[in-house]
Regions:
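N-terminal cap/leader regions of alpha/beta-hydrolase-fold enzymes
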Residues: 1-271
Length: 271
């Protein structure tokens, strides 16, 4: 399927602006479901743009916001800081990704400038994450899609890592018809998940116990609220196993199967 892609900005409820990547199927002006695609902690990058295009070829209008580009957040979360943080995280072996002592030891070897840049990103996104504000930005992304002439009114969300947690946070607003979580944290408090509008697909890695060990809490809340939920935990897979730009962590077998599940899930719930 031929696609039309565009880099754009959309307005938020507080009159800020968010940069975003838009992918639209080109097929005689037909209307399609929309999907909000939420990036990893690194911000919008070429990997996420590629995922947007892959989804769009399946018949979806996909909007991938770059959440850290708002005037409020771009002051502390700079592109340079994100890049240095990304390079730092990618230098850590998969089995050490959640080892805070190891991370601190490795960071101590860096220059004061790099430590400051990385610490700024960590402080904002890991220690004091503005989840409510970020969810508002995503809610505005849903509004953008609902107003787009190529969208038929059905909206889903999907996110990876940081974006997986934000995907379920957006789902808790009741504004999307289907939610996909790739190894994302539960909403806080997890009871908010009872407000999810419809179905949830959660995809996790067995070797990501900090995240995966809490999934049962989300399942319990959704089951009590009688919301459909499907959970898949891939053995021998690490956090971020879907990202094929990270060869240390990428798990081709798990990624391909997870993609099959995503396509079928959106087909069942959006089309």
């Amino acid at each position: 399927m031929e696609l039309k892609t565009e880099e754009l900005k959309y307005k938020t409820a507080d009159n800020d602006e968010i940069s975003a990547f838009l992918a639209i199927p080109e097929d005689n002006n037909a209307k399609h479901p929309g999907i909000v695609l939420i990036h990893e902690i690194f911000g919008l990058d070429d990997h996420i743009r590629d995922v947007a295009k892959r989804l769009s070829t399946q018949g979806y209008v996909v909007l991938a916001p770059d959440l850290f580009t708002s005037n409020k957040l771009s002051q502390t979360i700079t592109k340079d800081g994100i890049m240095k943080t990304m390079n730092f995280i990618m230098s850590i072996p998969p089995e050490k990704q959640r080892d805070e002592a190891y991370r601190a030891e490795q960071m101590a070897k860096m220059s004061p400038e790099d430590q400051k840049a990385i610490s700024g990103v960590y402080q904002t996104l890991f220690m004091n994450r503005p989840t409510e504000l970020l969810t508002q930005y995503l809610s505005s992304a849903v509004d953008f899609l609902n107003q787009h002439p190529s969208v038929n009114g059905k909206i889903g969300s999907i996110g990876f890592c940081f974006g997986g947690g934000m995907s379920i946070s957006l789902g808790c607003t009741g504004k999307v018809d289907a939610v996909v979580i790739f190894y994302g944290e539960n909403p806080e408090p997890v009871e908010k998940a009872k407000n999810v509008k419809n179905a949830v697909l959660g995809i996790y890695a067995a070797n990501d116990t900090r995240i995966t060990s809490n999934v049962h809490e989300l399942v319990k809340v959704l089951a009590e609220a009688k919301k459909p939920i499907t959970i898949k935990v891939y053995p021998n897979a690490y956090h971020a196993f879907f990202n094929d730009t990270r060869p240390q962590i990428y798990n081709e077998k798990a990624a391909k199967d997870a993609w099959r599940m995503v396509i079928n899930f959106f087909k069942d719930n959006l089309q």
